[in-house]
């Protein structure tokens, strides 16, 4: 090796060593200062979340975790649901946000789980399989992507839509965010690792995000209506019956109007939940049970459940 290359290599090693030492010094200072590590997107669920090029974040298959005071388990599809059976039963696919997933209730307390028990108690001989494909934080845009790429592949007989609250939250346009994440997925994975393991990086990222928070709604009311219409149209093309859920506490104003307009235009039933809530958004355990009963009543009224 020539003296020139030895000199360059020495300079490179010196630069790397100096940078590493500087980073370690900053990290030590952050630890002494008591700065916390970054928290996962959903607290207590760090080991069960993974990046997704389709949906940004999703739950890992076969994972046991805890979220909002309640334990959960995922099946081989990463859903909070029993394993999907191929036994000829009629499948009811419930897609939505945390109100579908079952926020703050045990595994058997979500409305899809309660609906399954109510259907199992019937004696007409028809077998039904309710699949809980809800995910906390998801918007109607996530629902459309999921239905198109995965949901319809499950061959549901009935589809239940439950979106709206997360669409209305202000954190920037979700379609733009997902497009950027797809382009930069390796960078996002490194970002996640550093956020969860470096106090200095977590501190810098928090302040950076706060300074550039996007005030736009994740999905505006017009596109919310378009997403609903696209999901219903996709389902109908496959011969799937569709209904929608409305949570009156979170779907007043333009989002509720968009849902009502699409429901009228495409003639789909809407079940409105007005029962007790755990917080501003989510039903209580008793509320999920009442919602499941309302859904079953409407399914019977439509003639979709015999």
For every predicted segment, state its role.
Residues 14, 279-306:
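Histidine-centered active-site loop/cap adjacent to the catalytic His
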Residues 126-144, 149:
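A conserved hydrophobic secondary-structure block that centers on an alpha-helix together
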Residues 164-261, 265-281, 296:
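Serine-dependent acyl-ester chemistry module
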Residues 33-118, 122-123:
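Membrane/wall-proximal cationic-aromatic binding patches
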Residues 91-95, 131, 159-161:
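Conserved beta-strand elements of the Class I
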Residues 140, 144, 221, 225, ...:
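Short, amphipathic alpha-helical "lid/cap" segments that border enzyme active or binding sites
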Residues 151, 155-160:
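Proline-aspartate-enriched helix->loop->beta-strand connector
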Residues 13-29:
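Hydrophobic membrane-insertion alpha-helices, especially the h-region
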